[in-house]
Amino acid sequence: MNGTEGPNFYVPFSNKTGVVRSPFEYPQYYLAEPWQFSMLAAYMFLLIVLGFPINFLTLYVTVQHKKLRTPLNYILLNLAVADLFMVFGGFTTTLYTSLHGYFVFGPTGCNLEGFFATLGGEIALWSLVVLAIERYVVVCKPMSNFRFGENHAIMGVGLTWVMALACAAPPLVGWSRYIPEGMQCSCGIDYYTLKPEVNNESFVIYMFVVHFTIPMIVIFFCYGQLVFTVKEAAAQQQESATTQKAEKEVTRMVIIMVIAFLICWVPYASVAFYIFTHQGFNFGPIFMTLPAFFAKAAAIYNPVIYIMMNKQFRTCMITTLCCGKNPLGDDEVSASASKTETSQVAPA
């Protein structure tokens, strides 16, 4: 066995020399050098310093400016809330534990940290699914003159939470479990063992199929259809140049969000799947820690992408930060750019 399993942990280090200790009780400096734990703490501090202000600002600016409260923005705000869950429920905890070299909050704290980190990641994934469906319904028009309105956005937000809880809650009630991972300073789903006592194998399969593969299939299908429809509409000049530009800007923004999500989460999911399907494989703590670095960066990129690619939101943010004045003098964007969900790009 290339790892050491305890009642509520799995340390990726053989205990032949007898040095392995519970990650809830002793520093894990036999897994990595102390300076590496310090680097992990510094990275968590950076994510907190960047992640909290930018996501909080996203929420605050939307509350301050009524024009931003569009159905599409409800989903984007949901992403900001998910990111804040990751900041407060995950990053702050990992910062503190990495400074101590082990998970000082015990199994209960591990459950809470793992729950919030998983919840935030799943809300983000399912929010991207809802955004993909919204873009598909609005642009491709599979249901004639359907309009994506406030009630649909609220139902979409509700769906993201239901599906996220369906993934994050089971380990708390006996289906799988949360355990320290990587350098043992943060917690996640147990990908390392089969653990029949908690039916871990069935849960991991369920999670990869329902909460990763299916969402990815939906997203790629929607955007495949969307790209084809937009190209056909542009070729036939079925819409005004202004409407086409507005649709393309929103669609481009959402597609970039999906690409960023894949860059952040696919390495983590791939490594987790590899570990799970290669039980007994000899891997070190850094093998899982590095992909987790990419995954945790997800709390920053969504609001950055939105601010950079949405002129109306960017203008409102600058106005809010500058006490009601915009020193850049940007003109207000047209209604078509802020309410693209009602446009009429016809299907090919």
UniProtKB/Swiss-Prot annotation:
Glycan-modified residues: 2, 15
The keyword Oxidoreductase is assigned to this record: no
Keyword Lipid biosynthesis: no
Post-translational modification: Phosphorylated on some or all of the serine and threonine residues present in the C-terminal region.
Annotated signal peptide: none
PTM-bearing positions, type N-acetylmethionine: 1
Localization per record: Membrane; Cell projection, Cilium, Photoreceptor outer segment
Motif 'Ionic lock' involved in activated form stabilization in this chain: 134-136
Transmembrane regions listed in the UniProt entry: 37-61, 74-96, 111-133, 153-173, 203-224, 253-274, 287-308
GO molecular function, one term: metal ion binding
Region of interest (Interaction with SAG), residue spans: 330-348
Self-association and partners: Homodimer. Interacts (phosphorylated form) with SAG. Interacts with GNAT1. Interacts with GNAT3. SAG and G-proteins compete for a common binding site. Interacts with GRK1. Interacts with PRCD; the interaction promotes PRCD stability. Forms a complex with ASAP1 and ARF4. Forms a complex with ASAP1, RAB11A, Rabin8/RAB3IP, ARF4 and RAB11FIP3; the complex regulates Golgi-to-cilia rhodopsin/RHO transport in photoreceptors.
PANTHER family: OPSIN
Function field: Photoreceptor required for image-forming vision at low light intensity. Required for photoreceptor cell viability after birth. Light-induced isomerization of 11-cis to all-trans retinal triggers a conformational change that activates signaling via G-proteins. Subsequent receptor phosphorylation mediates displacement of the bound G-protein alpha subunit by the arrestin SAG and terminates signaling.
This protein's name: Rhodopsin
Organism: Pagophilus groenlandicus
Gene (name only): RHO
